[in-house]
């Protein structure tokens, strides 16, 4: 299993916010009654696309990656932000997986053609997207022979 780096669909603009820490961490802090100030950078909203590959041929010959492993991987990807909430990640969530499968172990089409068949676009009447609902995700109606795509949420 290989995954590329995620890229934002639209440009993202980090915003700097000031934070104040009021928690007393040591006895000395309690005596001084100090607070700490700092800065934090956030991205108010971003929709990211990540692409990945699984080689059925390598799974059979080398790694032993199985359908059970794939099911476990999908569960982990879907829940990767659910069990590790953090102010740093806000409300990050996996929204959709589009999975292409080949009839042939070596593949029926190059990966780039399949990635190109998936389009993510901001809706025309939206200037600043602040929700997944502001985007349209489409998969081409015509795929290479021997390839199927399934949309999983």
Place the predicted regions along the sequence by residue.
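Basic polyanion-binding and macromolecular-assembly surfaces
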Residues: 1-153
């Amino acid at each position: 299993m290989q995954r590329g780096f995620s890229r934002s669909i639209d440009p993202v603009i980090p915003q700097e916010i000031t934070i104040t820490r009021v928690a007393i961490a040591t006895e000395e802090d309690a005596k001084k009654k100090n607070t700490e100030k700092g800065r934090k950078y956030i991205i108010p909203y971003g929709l990211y696309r990540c692409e990945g590959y699984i080689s059925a041929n390598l799974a059979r010959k080398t790694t032993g990656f199985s359908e059970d492993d794939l099911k476990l991987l999908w569960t982990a990807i879907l829940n990767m932000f659910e069990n590790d909430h953090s102010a740093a990640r806000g409300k990050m969530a996996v929204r959709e997986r589009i999975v292409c499968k080949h009839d042939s172990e070596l593949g029926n089409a190059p990966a780039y053609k399949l990635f190109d068949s998936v389009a993510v676009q901001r809706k025309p009447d939206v200037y600043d997207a602040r929700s997944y609902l502001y985007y349209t995700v489409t998969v081409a109606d015509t795929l290479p022979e021997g390839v199927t795509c399934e949309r999983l949420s």
